[in-house]
Amino acid sequence: MTRSALVFALRFGALVMLIVGSVHAQDLAANWQGSFRENGEQRRVVLEIAKGDAGTWKAAGCFIEFLHDPAKVDSFAVNGSSVELKLNEGKGLLAGVVAAGGGEISGTWTWDGQTEPLVLRRAGGETAWKVPFDYQYHMKDVTYLRPTKDEARIAFAPKLAVDYMEQGALAWTGDWKCVACHTNGSYMVVRPLMTERLGPPQKALRDFFVGTLNEELATDEKDLKPEYDSTQAVYVAAGLAIWDAHVTHKLSADTAEALGMMFRVQRADGDWTISDDNNPPLESNRYQLATVAARAVGNAPEWEAAQRGTAVGAKIELLKSYLRAERKLQGDYDRVDLLWAAAEWPGLLDDGQKQDLVAMILKHQQADGGWSIRTFAKPEEWGKGNRAEKLRAEVELSEPPSDGHMTGLALIALRSAGVAAGDARVQRGVAWLLKNQRASGRWYTRSLNRDGWQFITYSGTVYPLLALEMCGALPAPGVAKTAVARR
């Protein structure tokens, strides 16, 4: 790992240094790297050992795979040929001996009470591992590097896109163990709609949502305050309801409980709280989240009718009123989600309102046939406006390129509203998607937040797949069997 790589890691909070230890004649100053196993996963660790002030040693550690558990060096000591490194407040311990030739440190690695053999080797040049955090999703044999605008375009390869959709959702869920609107949340509110074409979604994702629901149901009533973050509750309810509508075709007890939980934490004005509303477009605006809640209600088989005349029924009407009033919106972007929700929840909007939204979407279509998310709202309109400086500094500000997220979402909304698949404007959008898939199977969308993870590229691939399916441009079943299904 180069020094510039280490500086990069430090800026992202992955690296912590502590200076301790005694002087030893052996020159340990180098970058060292090695692998160990933790819960069946191979994990890689990189150490930078250098001389500090007054002849002491200093050590810096970096896990390449531990995105959410960075290496924090507590102490580093050298005694003769022996070295000892303690990390993360006692969670990790390296005890080793420097080989006679000075090229290896052999010993044991203990992490969370589990001890494994570990050999660290000097690394440099071509042998050094890449900068940490260079991937978007990683879990066992699944690794997707971070998307870039320079990734090569390929001829349409649906299997690559489906593999990414399936594997990315599993990798996020297994690694982070949370419901995230940008990944497994998007999977659960989109993937079931492709059941007829691709087969059922992965049951493991539904099971995870049910487990999350059970944790929510166990939440103490006093903790369900107005500031309670409801994003997860909304996505769990929507994911389970859409699963019922398109996979089992009947309401499950889990879905009924999830919908009850969702309305239990609804705010008095009809929307839901987002505690970290800094991440547009999916985790930044209460109105947009309310459109997801609307999809939950509209999809749950025979559920809404059973709520009439009840307290929950009154809350459903409150949601309708809230959405019809169009409160604080992220420009036209949230109106696209409103049209999608209205198509799945009859009675939310009248035909005239829907046609106005259709016209708005078509007005945003670009010359190349695609749509750009950046034309749908001014920089200050996204979330709390906290990304405006970043967005205004982009070179493409005046002519933003079409992207997978918005092109897919626009086509979904148009088709949901009844615009024919053969409509020339729809076909121009389909043509853009077929020409702009990247080598990894994804469609690229530049993040509105920060140029790092680019998680929007996940919805920016899931949306195009559904859009193509709705336009009759996704191949028949059989082409989309994935590595995930075989694991």
Model-inferred region functions:
Residues 477-485:
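Intrinsically disordered, low-complexity segments enriched in small/polar and acidic residues
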Residues 1-8:
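N-terminal secretory signal peptides that target proteins for export/translocation
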Residues 26-118:
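Central antiparallel beta-sheet cores of small beta-barrel/beta-sandwich binding domains
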Residues 121-125:
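Short beta-strand edge segments in extracellular beta-sheet folds
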Residues 9-21:
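Bacterial N-terminal signal peptides
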Residues 202-218:
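Active-site-surrounding "flap" and adjacent substrate/cofactor-binding loops of secreted or lumenal enzymes
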Residues 135-156, 174-200, 219-260, 267-316, ...:
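An alpha-helical repeat/solenoid feature that recognizes helix-turn-helix modules
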